[in-house]
């Protein structure tokens, strides 16, 4: 099968969607399919051979974060050329309804199209503003996937339609078999708690963790907090400096270091306040053997089976987080029982299972298709029609 994957977000810096697209591409290639990925990337950025860079991206505020996208008539011409030259049996778009490569590809492609929806949000001025333009395009997506119930809810409430839920994937063995790093390995006397996220994004919850550290150390004085991720977080650093070597900032870490961190830490803490549709890092931490302590946002409740495969605390409440961390660090027998349940839970998210489900959607779409993907001639006039809607405030 010839599959064209479109990632809206830049490969210059990996996030959850980029990793999902990369891993799916490599799993499909491993199974013998032909795959081409279209994604924003600078010419100087090293990318896998199967990635076709679409050019420089620009930062756009979106859903409490910064998305790096590219969009416009020049990019649109590149998308049409990629569609025409790819001779794809099927095109699979990620986040097709944000102003990005995916939206351009949806307009450009005529034929079997699958769309995956990753975003979860309560309300969006941008989605409401653009819905008159994009809702008619929904009919072009013959197979719709949402990565979680929250992502499906967002699609249904904002744009109508429906989608089958297929979760994000993780290579479980990669994390389960990673080696421990002695710098990060906890002991009964000095257990380690890991945080990973963009430090300057408030919704990732570092301020919540920073406010809880003192109370945890008052009860578990040997605890060590390992804070990984890019960003300055000046206020939080100043607050945490008072705890000396009980808190270590690791900076940005590689995928290999992330796997070792989750294999080494006793607890992984996810204090996000919202804007998460799934929680892929929770699954990675569970696969690595860390006990997950997470805020009780809907996406995290789903991943942790309502607290059976991890521990939940009240969102945005440092005192609740501190109490939950103290319990996790103090009751080691109970924590090990939770870890055992988590090891079973994560198997449903392994790429071997997730790819089977995605291929099932592909088969359904292709069973009703009358021709492979080709360029939609109407796409040559699309930019003018989209421009007015997409230049409005987004999210």
Language-model-derived ranges and their functions:
Residues 320, 327, 334-348, 360, ...:
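A short, well-ordered alpha-helix in the C-terminal region of glycosyltransferases
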Residues 306-307, 311-318, 327-333:
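Conserved acidic donor-binding segment of nucleotide-sugar-dependent glycosyltransferases
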Residues 236-260:
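Nucleotide-activated donor-binding/catalytic signature segment of Leloir-type glycosyltransferases, i.e.
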Residues 125, 170-189, 237:
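Acidic anion/phosphate-binding donor-loop and adjacent secondary structure
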Residues 291-294:
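Short hydrophobic beta-strand element within catalytic cores of glycosyltransferases
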Residues 41, 150, 169:
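Carbohydrate-associated surface elements
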Residues 184-204, 210-214, 226:
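Conserved donor-binding/catalytic core segment of Leloir-type glycosyltransferases
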Residues 41-42, 196, 222-237:
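Glycosyltransferase donor-sugar binding loop
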